Curated annotation (Swiss-Prot):
The lineage of its organism: Bacteria, Pseudomonadati, Pseudomonadota, Alphaproteobacteria, Rickettsiales. Belongs to the pseudouridine synthase RsuA family. The keyword Cytoplasm does not apply. PANTHER family: PSEUDOURIDINE SYNTHASE FAMILY PROTEIN-RELATED (PTHR47683), RIBOSOMAL LARGE SUBUNIT PSEUDOURIDINE SYNTHASE B (PTHR47683:SF3). This is Uncharacterized RNA pseudouridine synthase RP544. GO terms for biological process: enzyme-directed rRNA pseudouridine synthesis. Its EC number is 5.4.99.-. It comes from Rickettsia prowazekii (strain Madrid E).
């Protein structure tokens, strides 16, 4: 037996919190009967509908590494009709992203069919390392020679773990940035604060998972063995 909200989340429909809202809002049925309590227990024999759509309540959590190209947004529906990551994914079941990459960023984006798994990866207590390669225009010394930790920008605190100069040419510099808790546009805001303009941002690692030789637009599934190892290491 398992709680209804968890089953819906594990099916990749939404997060567990949003699943609870759907249940309370009367959008969920078990064997044709509307259920209003998120704490309701169900098993594999029950037929579950969410907003009129049957879900698979027996699937195992799965995880994919996807190389998100520039120009796609990480959402299922966009009010501005921009191209989304999920419109480009062919051959995958319904998935959700673990975290986000903004429109002009690229690189490693984790996808899963399990809302519970996504929650485990995203919560700050997991302390999963995110590594980025960043190209920026401007004087790198202004950033590197000042204290970039515990910055308060527009009322929001940012605390990158490390920023390291990789190489420098006449107009641009490449940096490695390591975060343990990513906030919206955190890297771009920090660089802008020190007068640098980010013109390329690539996430290359999330936890122990790396982008490797994956090309933009391609994805690969993580084996159960590697997924289990990742979960043991981090949680």
């Amino acid at each position: 037996m398992c709680r209804l909200a968890k089953i819906i989340s594990n099916a990749g429909v939404c997060s567990r919190r949003n699943a609870e809202k759907l249940i309370v809002g009367g959008k969920v049925k078990i064997d044709g009967i509307t259920i209003l309590s998120p704490a309701t227990n169900v098993d594999m024999s029950n037929q579950i509908e969410v907003s009129g759509r049957l879900i698979n309540n027996t699937q195992k959590p799965r995880l994919w590494i996807y190389y998100k190209p520039v120009g796609l947004i990480t959402t299922h529906k966009d009010p501005l009709s921009r191209k989304t990551v999920f419109e480009q994914l062919i051959g995958l079941p319904r998935v959700i992203s673990i975290g986000r990459l903004d429109l002009n960023s690229e690189g490693l984006l984790l996808l899963t069919n399990s809302g519970d798994l996504a929650h485990q990866f995203e919560m700050p207590a997991s302390k999963l390392k995110r590594v980025y390669n960043v190209r920026a225009y401007g004087n790198p010394n202004i950033l590197l020679k000042n204290n970039y930790k515990n910055l308060k920008i527009d009322g929001i605190f940012y605390n990158p773990h490390s920023i390291k100069l990789l190489r420098q040419n006449k107009s641009n510099s490449w940096f490695e940035v390591v975060l343990f808790e990513g906030k919206n546009r955190e890297i771009r805001r920090i660089f802008e604060y020190f007068g640098l303009q980010v013109n390329k941002l690539i996430r290359i690692q999330y936890g122990a998972l790396k982008i490797g030789n994956l090309k933009p637009g391609n994805y690969q599934e993580i084996s159960n063995k590697i997924l289990e190892k990742q979960l043991v290491m981090c949680f």
